[in-house]
Amino acid sequence: MKVIFSLKRIRRNIAILLTALMLFASGATAASAAVHENTRRPVIDAKSAALYSVTTDEMLYAKNPDQRVEPWSTTKLMTALVVAETMDLNQEVTVSKKAASMGGSTMNLVAGEKVTVRQLMYGLLLESGNDAAYALGQADGDGSIKTFAAKMNARAKKLGCKGTHFVNPNGLKAKNHYTTAADYVKIARAALANKTVFKIAGTKVYHMDATNKSHARTIETHLDLIEKKGSGVVAGKTGYWEDDDCSVALMYDKKGLKMILVQFGANMETRAKDGAKLLKFGTEKIVTKKATNPKKSVGNVRVKYGARTLVKTYAKGTVLTYPKDGSADSISVKENYKDVVKAPLKSGDKVGTLEVYCDGKKVGSTPLVVHENIEKGWFLSRFYISNRATIAIGVILVLLALIIGFLVRRRKNRKAEETLAPKKAEVAAEKTSDVPENVDDHPEDRYL
C-alpha cells in the first residue's frame, strides 16, 4: 500500500510541476509578445517627431509633439505658403543688399539682381536659400521682415497652431522663433496642399536662366528621401543648424496612403534613416484596399431633358485606407449627386461624388460618372419622363381614348335604345290594335 501511495504522490508532483512549467512558458511567451509589440514602435534619434496620416486623419506616431523646438529651414515651408497665397509668381524682385548678405545656405544672389518670385521660390525650397527667403519676405512685407513675419504668424494661427511663433522667413536662429511637431504637421500639410508649393518642393533639379547679375544656375534639392526611387516621398523641406540638430518636414504619397512626417532635433547622419523607419511604421499601421469597383454600378441618377432619365452611375475609382485594427465591415459609402443633372451627357461625365466612410468618419471620395452617352429627349423629358416612357404614355393614352370612345358610343347607343323603347312599344301596341278580332261566333260557317 505504501508503494502505491508513493507512486500516486510522485504522479501528482509531476503533474503540478508540468502545470507550473506550462504557466511559466505561457507567461514568458506573453511577456515576449509584449516586448515585441513595444519594439515595433520605432526608436529614433530626433528629440521631437510626428507622423500624421492625411488619408485617415489620425496621428500614427508622436514623440514629444508639444515640445518647443527650433524649426530651422523648415520655416521656409511657411514662407513659401504665404508667398504662394499672396504674390504673383511672375512678379520681378530686385535683391537688396541685406538679402544678398545672408549667410549659411544661399542661392548666391547679388545685390541689385533682378529675379522673379518663381525663381526665388525654387531657390528657397530646393537650395534652402536664406537670401531667397529674405528677398521674398521683403517683397511680400512691403520692405519689412517684421510685417512678413506677422503674416506668417497670422497664417499659423489660422491653421490652429498654438505653440508656434515666427520672427524671420528663413529660420536662422532668433529669439522667440519656435514651433512644435504637432503644429508643424498642420503647417506642412497646408503648405504641401498648395499646388505651387507642392510642385516646387517636389522638384529635384531646377535650371534657372541667367539674370542681369548672374550666369544661369542649376539648383538641386537637399531632401535625401525624395532622391530614392520607391521611397514614396514626393515633396518636403529639410533644416540644418548643427550635425545633431537637424529638421525635416515632408509628404509621403504612395498607393493611396498620404502622410506628413516632421522631425526636429534630429541627427544629420540618421535623419533620413529614421524618416524611412517612421514611414515604414506608418504603412504597416494602415490597410490599403479598393473601396469601389469602377466596373460595378453603385446607383442611379435622374437626368433632366434626357432621352433616358434614369441612368446608372459608377465610381471613377478610389483606394481606401483605414487603420489596421479597424474592420472592413465598418466601411460605408454615400452617394451625393448634383442638384440637377441635365442632358446631354457624355460617357465619363461627372454627375456626383461617392464619399467613403470608415467608422462614421469620412476617409475618401471619388467622382461618380456615367458610362454612356445620353442625348436630349422630347418635350416630356423636362419632367424627367424618358422618350420610351413618353411612347408608352402615348400608347396608353391612345388605348384609353379608344376604350373611352367605345364606352361613350355604347352608352349613347344604350341611351338611344332606352329613349326609343317606349315609342317602339306604342307602335307595336298600335299595330296590335288594328288587327280584327278573330271571334268565331258562327263556327258552322267554316263549312259553307
Model-derived features: where do they sit?
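Internal alpha-helical transmembrane segments of multi-pass membrane proteins, especially GPCRs
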Residues: 15-19, 82, 202
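N-terminal, intrinsically disordered, polar/charged segments of Gram-positive cell-envelope systems
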Residues: 34-42, 50-51, 56, 419-447
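Short, Lys/Arg-rich N-terminal segment immediately upstream of the first membrane anchor
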Residues: 2-10, 39, 62, 379-385
